[in-house]
Amino acid sequence: MRTNYCGLIDVQYLDQTVILYGWVHRRRDHGGVIFVDLRDREGLVQVVCDPDNPTAFQVAEKIRNEFVVRITGRVRHRPPGTVNPNLISGEIEVLVSSIDILNASLTPPFLMDDESLSEATRLEHRYLDLRRPQMQENLRLRYKVAMAVRLFLDQHGFIDVETPMLTKSTPEGARDYLVPSRVNTGHFFALPQSPQLFKQLLMVSGFDRYYQITKCFRDEDLRADRQPEFTQIDIETSFLNESQIMQMMERMICTVFKSVRNIDLPTPFPRLTHGEAMSKYGSDKPDMRVSLVLTELTDVMQEVEFKVFREAALRTGGRVAALRVPGGGALSRKEIDDYTGFVAIYGAKGLAYIKVNALEKGMDGLQSPILKFLPENVIQIVLERTGAKDGDLIFFGADKAQVVNEALGALRAKVGHDRGLAESGWKPLWVVDFPMFERDEEENRWKALHHPFTSPAEGHEDLLETDPEKALSKAYDMVLNGSEIGGGSVRIHRQEVQSKVFRALNIGADEANEKFGFLLEALQYGAPPHGGIAFGLDRIVAMMAGAESIREVIAFPKTQRAQCLLTHAPSTVGEKQLRELHIKLRHA
């Protein structure tokens, strides 16, 4: 039986006999002696095979990288000059008395410490990739975060309740993954996008405080921070208002960061309304490490000669805004062109700018292709509002407000980090007072900004029917360093209010009853006031790990094409299986 993990042996075990199991990380022959770096999940230890022990030495001559071995030996000091201060085991080595090969290995397609691997290679051989120390550390970190969450919630009276994985397809924003029913011909289950409705029903059932760390599924286009299946820390509670829920969740996140990473998040988290966030930062998840802000200019551009600005300022739902970049006057033409290409990703048709060379020279101290289209008094207002100084550069966005916000909001974050205008550390905040609805221009109707079960703000219930555009909600998002790590709301607990929301969303009574009849009925049986939040576990762990993608903290992730390169899922299935499910494929 193993006595120790390789990476945890240190000088306290000197002269003790240990039994180790692990993988051969590297084998070296030096001066007639064989050295083996033996690796397990805790790290490395140096093992020495001396020719004075011919039986063990003969076995050691056969081993290669990634062989699985059992080693018995005595712990001793490393010779002077060979200490490795980067390892816990760096002061000692194990002199082998016996060695057994438990399994051989093919030559691996890459070394475990190779940092230049393509992601495709890593995902194709994920079982080998996961042997690498960084991946071991990432998954250990994930475990610690989940345990810290469970401990906090247990201490605060929450109970873990599992909800169904096979459920009903309901409109929640993204496409569902559908599962055909064999026994109910023509009917389909859906994999849950979240446990939203079930956790609300648990509140109706009187469980008071619920949580679950669970898989959720969304069939949507993938980005670095998205997966078709992801893990959610799902939380719901009764009889707490939004402020009380936010305070408790703030304590939970602070506790998790402190216990897992010894990070003290600054408290209390500032609160920013959705309107302020979009106006000043162009984003509902602003990175507060970046000091740059947007400046509103719509009101002063309505009569200017420059057509792009004037038309955006006059159109309904249009916006003209500026972003001042301190020291940005040093940007080259190529750098500006690169930023122009960057904002094009977000729908911007161009990126006008003014370089501020010398304010004391008036118009002669400015440099821009658009100066001739703007009157001097308007330019003066721009300089005053943005607080421009010599050496600055001012970028402009003019289009539909959504395009301007997305383009300048993303540019703000990128320029801030590119130009050293971002602080280090952690900057959390709450974004609150979200609109209830947003306009779906393609379908010409309102859709829920979060989900249709979010409660309207106090005094906004009547607006659901009279002026939906102005209705605010009791929704709140927790944002950290520009990433939304959690989102929640107080829910609707009265059936008549839920019906009003459905009507505002153009969901008729028959459709509402077909899709949500069970919820509407449950709300009539003494549903308590309740609310909750859901955190993205993958995203939180990735941020703690400093990973560029959540794929780095998921054991077996999918690619951005929603494929598993290891198992080659999704795959075709046999005709017999399709017949059993009453499915016939139509080939395009």
Swiss-Prot record:
UniProt EC number: 6.1.1.23
Molecular function terms, GO-annotated: aspartate-tRNA ligase activity; aspartate-tRNA(Asn) ligase activity; ATP binding; nucleic acid binding
Sites where the protein binds ATP: R218, D219, E220, Q227, E484, G536, L537, D538, R539
Bridged cysteine pairs (disulfide): none
Positions bearing the site annotation: Important for tRNA non-discrimination: H30, G81
Catalytic activity: tRNA(Asx) + L-aspartate + ATP = L-aspartyl-tRNA(Asx) + AMP + diphosphate
InterPro entries: Aa-tRNA-synt_II, aa-tRNA-synth_II, aa-tRNA-synth_II/BPL/LPL, Asp-tRNA-ligase_1, Asp-tRNA-ligase_1_N, Asp/Asn-tRNA-synth_IIb, AspRS_core, GAD-like_sf
Main subcellular location of this protein, as a coarse class: cytoplasm
Binding site for L-aspartate: E172, R218, H450, R491
GO cellular component, one term: cytoplasm
Location of the region described as Aspartate in the Swiss-Prot/TrEMBL record: 196-199
GO biological process: aspartyl-tRNA aminoacylation
Pfam families with a match to the protein in the record: GAD, tRNA-synt_2, tRNA_anti-codon
Highest taxon in the source lineage: Bacteria
SUPFAM superfamilies in alphabetical order: Class II aaRS and biotin synthetases, GAD domain-like, Nucleic acid-binding proteins
Cellular localisation: Cytoplasm
Keywords: Aminoacyl-tRNA synthetase, ATP-binding, Cytoplasm, Ligase, Nucleotide-binding, Protein biosynthesis
Membership in a protein family: Belongs to the class-II aminoacyl-tRNA synthetase family. Type 1 subfamily.
Subunit structure: Homodimer.
Entry-linked PANTHER family: ASPARTATE--TRNA LIGASE, MITOCHONDRIAL (PTHR22594:SF5), ASPARTYL/LYSYL-TRNA SYNTHETASE (PTHR22594)
Biological role: Aspartyl-tRNA synthetase with relaxed tRNA specificity since it is able to aspartylate not only its cognate tRNA(Asp) but also tRNA(Asn). Reaction proceeds in two steps: L-aspartate is first activated by ATP to form Asp-AMP and then transferred to the acceptor end of tRNA(Asp/Asn).
Protein name: Aspartate--tRNA(Asp/Asn) ligase
Organism of provenance: Nitrosospira multiformis (strain ATCC 25196 / NCIMB 11849 / C 71)
Gene: aspS
